[in-house]
């Protein structure tokens, strides 16, 4: 009774503020937002989300926002070496029809706490692609390695092919897979060599001996498919030949042959299902990747 009386005494009749304590207003459009509207939203219905949003993140990861200026640089590069590539090779309608509707950026890399493995990007339901580690971008000296058969995966690498563009082609391959199935004979070629959870222990330079272009490709068939396609089109022919050579052990060329057999199925899939010549796609990707150094990434011109 005493406590109840004290509580009553402590109450007052202050007027309630009609304004919510939660910020429900949409952020005002800035110069970058206007550029995105013109280059992503209006022509392709792509929402390029560079602002941090908890609802768009995987709470298993400890993530930070993407830097504003580096998000601008990535948006310009992504348009040049991904959107405009498919526009040039497959046509504007292809991009409008099959591109993801949401691209979400985060500034830091995403690590699984239990395994220590890193997530380069994710594709969800053919609609959304998430890219991590945007803050690694060196705006003044953008570096896209198309000449090495195996990427530098050291923590300090600034290779944008490794972090973003091969990843984007990989994730887009998953979107295409979800739209149209590929020949299931692909799944049989390396059926006995997939490593499920143990793929993380297979180093990239050793992977070709077992018929894979990377350690991650050995996880399962869908990832194998996406890895072969994305590695092939983001590397020069010289780099690809070096990768194939790593699949030869003495007189044993079974690793190399497995990669080539799977590549042939991918080649037929792209041509038959999407009317895309994989070698023309590679030619445009590598050409545009080499031209990125000439882009002005500091302005929104």
Describe the predicted segments one by one.
Residues 145-183, 226:
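Active-site recognition of the HExxH zinc-binding catalytic motif
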Residues 165-207:
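Acidic, glycine-rich loop-and-strand cores that form catalytic or ligand-binding grooves
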Residues 72-136:
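Auxiliary, metal-adjacent structural segments of Zn-dependent hydrolase domains
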